[in-house]
Amino acid sequence: MTTAHRPTFDPARGKEALRGPAYHQRLLPAYTHLKVRQSGQGTEGEAARRDLRAELLQAEAAHFAKKNGAPVPEASAESTPKRQLEGAPANGGDGELEEDPEAKRRRILEETREIDADSEASEEDSSEDESDDEDEAAELMRELEKIKKERLAQKEKEERERAAKEEEQREVDIARGNPLLNPSDFNIKRRWDDDVVFKNQARGTEDKRGKEFVNDLLRSDFHKKFMSKYVR
């Protein structure tokens, strides 16, 4: 991040200039106290008191229950093993807080048995769903093949019809383009400029009538012929 927009706190001075007692804020000591973890922030003692295996089994049971649509079992205080409190004697009056190893083993076996049963049921359901999905996919593929064949047949039919129409039109064009079959095409057509005023002025000058003022288009021969042909 640039600091070009900040004002100069300590401008340059000569060697003989005396410096005052002011210090920049960045030159002051900072972070003089070390932060430590407080209670509830995952200290070593809290990590030692956690039973990670029980938490994992409980999370797996909740997951399979949610997947199978069964009610999620609530976490009970009895299901979580109680560890020895810090500062308590190892063999004292509070020894009953620790769970019996045999009871703990039986509880873990029961939980794992339930989880295995749930997983087997979910596997059976998933296998049935997979078989149904395969049947539906096969049916869809058959329908798709049928639609493709119908479209291909329709396209071939349209191609044949178009080819037949093109062949028929070609034969008609050939027949009409034959001058022997169309004698009317031998008629000589007049040019569009046959009756204009200034066409072939040098031809037939000896047969010209008297001098006429042709620049007046309203009284020219072309205008008269045009009016008599298309207006009258």
UniProtKB/Swiss-Prot annotation:
Record field: compositional bias (Basic and acidic residues): 139-174
Feature: compositional bias, Acidic residues: 117-138
UniProt keyword Coiled coil, yes or no: yes
Region (Disordered): 1-21, 63-186
Coiled coil: 124-176
GO CC annotations, alphabetized: catalytic step 2 spliceosome; nucleus; post-mRNA release spliceosomal complex; Prp19 complex
InterPro entries, per database record: Cwf_Cwc_15
A Pfam family hit: Cwf_Cwc_15
Gene Ontology biological process: mRNA cis splicing, via spliceosome; mRNA splicing, via spliceosome
Any GO molecular function: RNA binding
Keywords, ordered alphabetically: Coiled coil, mRNA processing, mRNA splicing, Nucleus, Spliceosome
Subcellular location: Nucleus
Subunit structure: Associated with the spliceosome.
Role description: Involved in pre-mRNA splicing.
PANTHER family named in the record: CELL CYCLE CONTROL PROTEIN CWF15, SPLICEOSOME-ASSOCIATED PROTEIN CWC15 HOMOLOG
Family, as annotated: Belongs to the CWC15 family.
The protein, known as: Pre-mRNA-splicing factor cwc15
